[in-house]
Regions:
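Catalytic-core regions built around general acid/base machinery
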Residues: 109-120
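Glycine-centered short loops/turns at secondary-structure junctions
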Residues: 120-121, 198
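Conserved phosphate-coupling serine/threonine residues in phosphotransfer and NTP-handling enzymes
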Residues: 127
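Asp-based, Mg2+/Mn2+-dependent phosphohydrolase catalytic module
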Residues: 1-5, 17-18, 115, 130-229
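N-terminal helical cap/lid subdomain that shapes the substrate entry/recognition surface
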Residues: 2-108
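A generic structural signal for short
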Residues: 62-63, 102, 123, 154, ...
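Short, conserved clusters of charged catalytic residues that mark active-site
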Residues: 108-109, 164
Length: 229
């Protein structure tokens, strides 16, 4: 019987794409990248997103450190445009990590589904995001008060989809995997990781990604979770 609901944060509750995009446009303007050969913010964002995803994959695989990720993603983006300026990359990286968590765009129906679920279940977060950043996001977006435990990969010592982070989460809460459901947008990290550990899972799948995993439900809007819980 499900008693505890674990949510992913980025791209599930907190709209990472919108918040990140808006901050990157701001940084393109603030650091006058148009004067350095990057004529449109969309060019900057397109290349950054590709490089950032590659860096996050390396970080999840423990191939680079948190500090490497923060340094390389902007340095490599600028280098793509022929800008070899370590200080500029460091400055942009610092501004991004400092400012982006204060942006508060959430997915539709976040508070509606939280209000529905919290009367029936205990709610928690499991996230691969950085400890200090995720807590700021949640506080600024008025999410913190709704969740009993906020499990970060840094605190758990492992990143999703590794079973260690799910083991840490259920031990922290004091339940078994069978009592839990994981809700997230990442098919590998959130859904496959949780299912392999023995949890049930609901796939937040707004882009209608096809898959063969045995899940409790697929939803394109968070409010649809009501049909399964």
């Amino acid at each position: 019987m499900i008693k505890h609901v674990f949510f992913d944060l980025d791209r599930t509750l907190w709209d990472f794409e919108k918040n990140s995009h808006n901050e990157l446009v701001n940084l393109w303007s603030k650091h006058q990248l148009h004067q350095k050969g990057i004529s449109l913010p969309e060019e900057f964002i397109r290349i950054y997103k590709r490089i950032n995803e590659d860096c996050w994959t390396l970080y999840r695989d423990n191939a680079i450190t948190k500090e490497d990720l923060r340094t390389k993603r902007f340095a490599n983006t600028l280098e793509y445009f022929g800008i070899l300026d370590a200080k500029l990359a460091e400055s942009i990286g610092h501004d991004y990590v400092t400012n982006c968590p204060y942006r508060t765009e959430l997915f539709p129906n976040v508070f509606e589904i939280i209000d529905y679920l919290k009367s029936k279940y205990e709610l928690h977060i499991i996230t691969n995001g950085f400890e200090e950043v995720q807590h700021v996001k949640m506080k600024q977006s008025n999410l913190t008060e709704h969740f009993s435990e906020i499990i970060t990969s840094e605190k758990a010592g492992a990143k999703k989809p590794h079973p260690q982070i799910f083991a840490y989460a259920v031990e922290k809460v004091g339940v078994s995997a069978q009592d839990c459901v994981m809700i997230g947008d990442d098919l590998l990290c959130d859904i496959e990781g949780a299912v392999d550990f023995g949890m049930q899972a609901i796939y937040f799948n707004p882009h209608k990604v096809k898959h063969n995993l045995n899940v409790l439900g697929n939803v394109q809007d968070l409010i649809e979770i009501k049909a399964f819980l």
